[in-house]
Amino acid sequence: GASSGIGYATALALSKAGAKVAIGARRVDKLKQLENEVKKNGGEALAQKLDVTKKTDCDAFVEQTVKKWGTVDILVNNAGLMPLSFVKNLKVDEWEQMIDVNIKGVLFCTAAVIPHLKEKKSGHIVNISSVAGRLVFPSGSVYCATKHAVTAFSEGLRQEFSARSNIRVTCIEPGVVETELLNTITDESLQS
């Protein structure tokens, strides 16, 4: 998601470096802010509403990008949720939501872009995971599992494409970053 935090900052930095950025998230108002900021700095942006839990949205996002600019060079999979809670609290709906966004979102967006990268025989897929994928903590069991899945998927995909394909896969595992991600914590005992 490009509407806040790491995704917002990444899109802005890429645009300042000269990249045309297709930006997606569920919150269109935040996307429009980013689109305006990119354009104010002389860059090009295409803001599109995107729900990464829907494969059709991911496919349409990539197709609209290709329609506008003719190609996709880089995919940054950044959408994520972190509604921390202890497993014993059985917030199963939150577990499903994290799996849908944090894992399926990466899979669906990657699936949408791979045919284009294979056709042009180059590209870069960047998956934003978390150090939590390697360092599990109480109340983060499910979140950590989703981030471990992103890390494992990234490594497998990197090996599948190998150096001969000219398609690179990078997994970034940031530590704690003060973003709106913290606002998705619903367990009151963990919000302080």
Task: Say what each PLM segment does.
Residues 19-34:
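Conserved glycine-rich Rossmann-like NAD(P)H-binding loop of the short-chain dehydrogenase/reductase
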Residues 28-29, 50-60, 92:
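The beta1-alpha1 cofactor-binding region of Rossmann-like NAD(H)/NADP(H)-dependent oxidoreductases
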Residues 88, 135-141:
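Active-site loop immediately N-terminal to the catalytic Tyr-X3-Lys motif
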Residues 86-87, 91-99:
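Substrate-binding pocket helix/loop in short-chain dehydrogenase/reductase
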Residues 110, 146:
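Active-site helix of classical SDR
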Residues 130:
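Residue(s) in the substrate-gating loop at a strand-loop-helix junction
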Residues 3-4:
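Conserved glycine-rich cofactor-binding loop
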